[in-house]
A protein has these predicted regions:
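Thiamine diphosphate
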Residues: 1-153
């Protein structure tokens, strides 16, 4: 990663700590009040600390939370594909776990909301989001069958 103007990345060493993105982003926003903070998390991962959206909203922290929505728990899908011959249970809408409605969640926590469905929308929507100092919840729809790489299970 290359960051301009002294930007930094804060993450877990393995980039695999579910639920860590929101607490880290809050800490960064409080420590560096003048800077904008970007938080990237998954649609399953955010469920572990979703209450932190209230903290972000209450203190009007300049955090843009990007939720990568692939319609389920991709790491669990990978585990089930590798060790259970692709027999899936409770990893996506089709197997018993519904995806959250992030637009309603943003409204409930009094956050601005933006939806990115296509690559062609990214530049224009990012310009709008990044030019605003309000906290945002940004849902980014991705391919539910996208392969993930990294730690093997």
């Amino acid at each position: 990663w290359h960051f301009n103007n002294g930007g930094k990345e804060i993450s877990s060493g393995a980039n695999a700590a579910m639920g860590l993105s929101l607490p880290l982003s809050i800490g960064a926003a409080v420590a560096e009040k003048k800077n904008q903070v970007l938080s990237v998390t998954g649609d399953g991962s955010i469920e572990l600390n979703i209450q932190e959206l209230k903290t972000i909203s209450h203190y009007k922290l300049n955090i843009k939370t990007f939720v990568i929505n692939n319609g389920g728990y991709v790491s669990m899908k990978k585990w089930q594909d590798n060790f259970f011959a692709g027999n899936r249970l409770d990893t996506e809408d089709l197997t018993g776990v519904g995806t959250l409605n992030f637009k309603k969640i943003a409204k409930a926590f009094d956050l601005k909301y933006e939806l990115i469905k296509r690559e062609s929308e990214i530049n224009s929507k990012l310009s709008k989001i990044m030019s605003n100092e309000s906290p945002y919840l940004v849902e980014v729809i991705t391919d539910p069958n996208q392969k993930i790489y990294g730690k093997e299970f």
